[in-house]
Amino acid sequence: MDIVTLAEVAGNLNVVGYGLAAIGPGIGLGILIGKTIESTARQPELGGRLQTLMFLGLAFVEVLALLGFVAAFIFQ
């Protein structure tokens, strides 16, 4: 194999790696939002506080996706 072919394979693996890294935050967001909706349905008076906490958790979960995206570029 020549260098160009190896670079193409490494580039493709980075894309696959980011795709796998995005699965975790996607599942996390689904669970987070689902549980927030479930909790709001049980206790509607806490809806505002739960929504605030959900957005805070959403920010933390999205950091994982961004780290996966950045890692794909760093480890080329």
Swiss-Prot record:
Q: Name one GO molecular function term.
A: proton-transporting ATP synthase activity, rotational mechanism
CDD domains reported in the protein's UniProt record = ATP-synt_Fo_c
Report the GO terms under cellular component: plasma membrane; proton-transporting ATP synthase complex; proton-transporting two-sector ATPase complex, proton-transporting domain
Q: Entry's SUPFAM superfamilies?
A: F1F0 ATP synthase subunit C
Carries keyword Transport?
A: yes
Question: What is its membrane topology?
Answer: Multi-pass membrane protein
Annotated compartments:
Cell membrane
Keyword Cytoplasm present in the record's keywords: the answer is no
Listed A to Z, the keywords are: ATP synthesis, Cell membrane, CF(0), Hydrogen ion transport, Ion transport, Lipid-binding, Membrane, Transmembrane, Transmembrane helix, Transport
Give the residue spans that cross the bilayer.
13-33, 55-75
What Pfam families does this protein map onto?
A: ATP-synt_C
Name the InterPro entries for this protein: ATP_synth_csu_bac/chlpt, ATP_synth_F0_csu, ATP_synth_F0_csu_DDCD_BS, ATP_synth_F0_csu_sf, ATPase_proteolipid_c-like_dom, F/V-ATP_Csub_sf
Q: Where is this site: Reversibly protonated during proton transport?
A: 62
**Protein family according to the UniProt entry:** Belongs to the ATPase C chain family.
Q: Which NCBIfam families match?
A: ATP_synt_c
Functional note: F(1)F(0) ATP synthase produces ATP from ADP in the presence of a proton or sodium gradient. F-type ATPases consist of two structural domains, F(1) containing the extramembraneous catalytic core and F(0) containing the membrane proton channel, linked together by a central stalk and a peripheral stalk. During catalysis, ATP synthesis in the catalytic domain of F(1) is coupled via a rotary mechanism of the central stalk subunits to proton translocation.
Q: How does it assemble?
A: F-type ATPases have 2 components, F(1) - the catalytic core - and F(0) - the membrane proton channel. F(1) has five subunits: alpha(3), beta(3), gamma(1), delta(1), epsilon(1). F(0) has three main subunits: a(1), b(2) and c(10-14). The alpha and beta chains form an alternating ring which encloses part of the gamma chain. F(1) is attached to F(0) by a central stalk formed by the gamma and epsilon chains, while a peripheral stalk is formed by the delta and b chains.
Supply the name of the protein.
Answer: ATP synthase subunit c
UniProt organism field: Bifidobacterium animalis subsp. lactis (strain AD011)
Taxon lineage:
Bacteria, Bacillati, Actinomycetota, Actinomycetes, Bifidobacteriales
